[in-house]
Curated annotation (Swiss-Prot):
This is FAD assembly factor SdhE. Coiled coil: none annotated. Belongs to the SdhE FAD assembly factor family. It comes from Psychrobacter arcticus (strain DSM 17307 / VKM B-2377 / 273-4). It is found in: Cytoplasm.
Amino acid sequence: MTINNQPEPTNEQRRIIYQARRGLKELDFYFEPYIKELYLTAEAAEQESFAQMLTHEDPDLLDYFTNQSRPEDDAMWALVNKIKTWRHSKSLS
């Protein structure tokens, strides 16, 4: 277990964590806390959706998180909304 009670990441999870570092602060606002607090304990399907999400270009991801467009994959769209809802509820507390 790591300091924040997350399990030690596998090599594949480390690769995904590294890929989650983006060049846009708007995306980092969502991705950094998600990686630190939820990613390692998420179900395998959610981790796979997150990995798939990271294959999208930053402008597309920004559009998803600002509701300008949505990904075709319903599981990815559900994850975008989960991360947004979770992150904004953290900001209010």
